[in-house]
């Protein structure tokens, strides 16, 4: 049995697990903590010369105050289009079009809204955990497919290693969740 095939299973598991964690972090960055965060809007698509362009490519997004974002378009003629795209995004923020720039004012989160956000955070967390577990199952199946070529002891050893990798990524997801939950519950 060529050990490189087994190593390929482990490296694929690691790579896919890292992608799950990265996507999880990206999805969490979209959850508003009551503080202005450019991540919330940077990928909103704006119609610009009949093409849909991410907001971050056609404007400068800054945080002048903790609960405010300021969008300064590079081309002032598209301010109305940006405003329209922001309205369509249903951001739950006050949008003020000042002519050549747009301000987004984020309301302070009340306790009820914080609890709702923690619930949605928990949904994202569970989805990420399930994805990691599915990757574990996939890797275990690949290892078992070699059972005619490797011993039962080796299969158990490889499954244990897969479980260890799985546990480390679940732990990362849980840490990220705890951090985000603390941010959400901070007043």
UniProtKB/Swiss-Prot annotation:
What Gene Ontology molecular function terms does this protein carry?
ribosomal large subunit binding
Major location, coarse class? cytoplasm
Q: Output the GO biological process annotations, alphabetical, semicolon-separated.
A: translational termination
Keywords, A to Z, come to: Cytoplasm, Protein biosynthesis
Pfam families in the record, alphabetically?
A: RRF
Electron transport found in the keyword field: no
Q: Does the keyword Cytoplasm apply?
A: yes
Q: Where does the record place it?
A: Cytoplasm
One Gene Ontology cellular component = cytoplasm
Return the InterPro entries for the record. Ribosome_recyc_fac (IPR002661), Ribosome_recyc_fac_dom (IPR023584), RRF_sf (IPR036191)
* Membership in a protein family: Belongs to the RRF family.
Q: Which NCBIfam families match?
A: frr
PANTHER family the UniProt entry points to: MITOCHONDRIAL RIBOSOME RECYCLING FACTOR PSEUDO 1 (PTHR20982:SF3), RIBOSOME RECYCLING FACTOR (PTHR20982)
Function of the molecule: Responsible for the release of ribosomes from messenger RNA at the termination of protein biosynthesis. May increase the efficiency of translation by recycling ribosomes from one round of translation to another.
Its protein name is Ribosome-recycling factor
Lineage start? Bacteria, Bacillati, Mycoplasmatota, Mycoplasmoidales, Metamycoplasmataceae
Q: Which gene encodes it?
A: frr
